[in-house]
Structure formats: C-alpha cells, structure tokens
Regions:
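FAD/FMN-dependent oxidoreductases across multiple families
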Residues: 128, 154-222
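Active-site-adjacent segment of FAD-dependent monooxygenases/related oxidoreductases
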Residues: 1
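Predominantly flavin-linked oxidoreductase catalytic cores and closely associated redox partners
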Residues: 7-8, 12-174, 213
Length: 223
C-alpha cells in the first residue's frame, strides 16, 4: 500500500539524516520579499476554546531553500500559495471526486491476484458521474471501491452509503460471499486533468502530487 511505501521511504530518509516531524501541522508559509523561505508549524496543546493547556508547545519556523508542498487535495498551504501568486490564472477550475473503498479477506485460494473489474451505473443515478472498481490482490484480498464526482446536486447523497448499495447487487454480493471486511478508507481525487494544472513553481516553492492535480483521471492513479 501507499502507506507502507511512505513508512519504508521515511526510514530511509531518516537514515540519511533527514528530519521527519510527525504530528506537526504546517500553519503558514514564510516569505521574504515574495520568496517562500519555509513553513511555520502549528501550535500544539490548545483546547477547543483556544486556551493553552499544560502541554502547550508553540510552533516553530522551519527555513528551507526549497519548500515542496505535497498536501493532497485542497491543502491549506497550497490554497494560500495558489491564491497569493494567482497560479490558476488561465486554467480550468479543478474537478473533484471522492473514492471510498473496502478491503475484504476472502477464503484461501479464491482470489486471483491481478483481477480487475470496473463498473458503471448502479447504484449511482443518471446525474452522478462515477463507477466502481474491484481488484484482486495478494493473500486473497479483494479491493472493492466506488468513485463518484463531488458535483452531485442532492445534498443527501452519502458516498459510503452508495458503496453499501453497490454490495447488494447480486454479482457483487456473490464475489463477497464468505468474505470478511477487514479495512476501509476514503480519499478525495483531483480529476481536472492537464488543463486544470496550476503553475507549479514560484520562487522558493513548488507543488507536487495531488496538490498539483497530477492524478491520471482515466486510470485513477497518481503514483
């Protein structure tokens, strides 16, 4: 999984002397004469009323020659940078979707690794863009998910509920027979494509990954 990959890569970075600050948010970008010079981390140990608790820890300024923003979709620092330097000028607005998925442990020998199926239509209405995916993984894991555009007009639509409806389809239900759901997750997706890519660099900073909108919308892959 991508989580396992990043943990593995993180250990290699630390062995090379790179500091990784887990649990710290980036509260704002630091500037010097319109050049990005780093990030200020967020304060920690603040209660819901904004008061300092006994474990209060003030944020610190981290300076860098180059600040790389890889916050995923709609990151707070990325939005600030895009707005400050008008990086979307002349570009199409970004288009968003959400993917929800479940991992199912199936009986031994029942899943062929590399199996791929895609669906369209049910359970989504005619006015909702999207479809489902089913992947056969190693160790008899079945990956079942549903992706739908976030431009739907009905405020009562619940993507997770739509995934549950998908599992009522006779064919999908037959695939999951005797299986057990072991994990689930969700992720927002930038689907605008090439013409929705912002300008990627400013003096001292750059955008990468979903912050830049690099996902391949046709394959729903960004790595």
């Amino acid at each position: 999984s991508l989580g396992q990959f990043t943990r593995w890569l993180g250990k290699i970075c630390e062995e090379e002397g790179i500091d990784i600050f887990c649990g710290f948010s980036g509260s704002e970008l630091l500037y010097e004469n319109e050049k990005v010079i780093g990030v200020r981390t967020g304060d920690r140990g603040i209660d819901k009323h904004g008061n300092h608790k006994s474990n209060f820890d003030q944020g610190v300024d981290i300076h860098a020659k180059a600040t790389v923003l890889g916050e995923g979709t709609r990151g707070s620092l990325t939005k600030t940078l895009i707005n400050k330097f008008n990086l979307m000028q002349g570009k199409n607005p970004q288009v968003w979707a959400i993917g929800v998925k479940e991992l199912w442990q199936m009986p031994k020998g029942s899943i062929k690794p590399g199996y791929v199926a895609h669906t369209m239509g049910f359970p989504l209405g005619h006015d909702i863009f999207g479809g489902a995916f089913i992947y056969g993984m190693k160790n008899d894991i079945l990956d079942l998910g549903l992706v739908m555009g976030l431009d739907y007009k009905d405020p009562s639509i619940d993507p997770h509920h739509e995934l549950q409806l998908l599992k009522t389809h006779p064919w999908v239900r037959s695939l999951l027979k005797n299986g057990k759901m072991i994990a689930y997750g969700a992720k927002s997706l930038p689907e605008g494509g090439y013409f929705s890519l912002p300008k990627l660099t400013v003096d001292g900073a750059m955008l990468i990954g979903d912050s830049a909108g690099f996902m391949n919308g046709q394959r729903l892959k960004g790595i």
